[in-house]
Amino acid sequence: MLVAYDIALDLVRALRPVVAQLRRYSPEAADQVERAASSIVLNLAEGRRRHGRDPRRFWDMAHGSAGEIRGALDLADAWGWQVDSAQARVLLDRELALLWGLTRRSRAKDASLLASGGTARPRQLGCGPSVRGSVAAWPASCG
């Protein structure tokens, strides 16, 4: 079991009162936090069932969702909304660190494989990583 998964569930529990407070100011922001928190848990659950390079894709999505929650909490502060998010922020910081470690470790593993002459993924003519946002992605046509 991933520690990040357990922390993600704790984060959801800590966010319940935060979401209720957010809803008074912005139902849309509250819904976004709910979706992002659920996305973290669901992507970690799916990623841990995958093998090879595939888990990193789910960990990257979970990391992005955690960043969305941070943005929503920062936005609430910027608007001056009275939202007590201290406990949730502590768990969120831990979750972000764990997810960064998971994605970073996976990237380092790919880099060491490439440095040793191996390939991280079989190459086809015209295939290679492209960068979409901050996440390296393989074209769908590449096997």
Where are these regions (language model features)?
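Amphipathic alpha-helical assembly/interaction segments
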Residues: 1-143
